[in-house]
Amino acid sequence: MSWKKDNYEVEEHPFETFVPLNALFLVVGTFPTHKNNFRFKFFYSGKDNSFWNIIEKVFNHSFKYNDGDKAVEERKTFLKSKAIGITDMHEKCYRKNNYSTDENLFPIILKDIFSILDEHTFIKRIILASRTEVSVALGL
């Protein structure tokens, strides 16, 4: 659902938080790229986003699929194998001029990161994949 006024559009997060039962790590981003930039319907799927390229290098892994449902399933399987969960800090936000950079996103509703941690008690580390302040990422 979205609502637009002037240069701002209200957007709700399009994806569910993904946290495998065995998750030891939780990657927390800000909000997905604008839907016009999706290569697949999952986190960090923007055409210009380098998250999955970095993951490939860090883990010496190569993803076979880079678009569509197979890319989503491949990444979920990979995250499960590495005990990594993934979410974003904004549940609903204003987006300025359809831009995807953090400085063009303004929170309306923040994700309750503490609830995720309460539900998944094995998570030992939070990895912030954003330039936004830590207090915003944790909903403080």
Give residue ranges: language-model regions.
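Glycine/proline-rich loop-helix segments at beta-alpha junctions forming the active-site rim
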Residues: 1-12, 17-20, 90-140
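Active-site and ligand/interface coordination hotspots across diverse enzymes
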Residues: 1-57, 61, 119-124
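Short, surface-exposed acidic-centric catalytic microdomains
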Residues: 36-103
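A structural signal for short, well-ordered beta-strand segments and their strand-loop junctions
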Residues: 26-27, 65, 85-88, 125-129
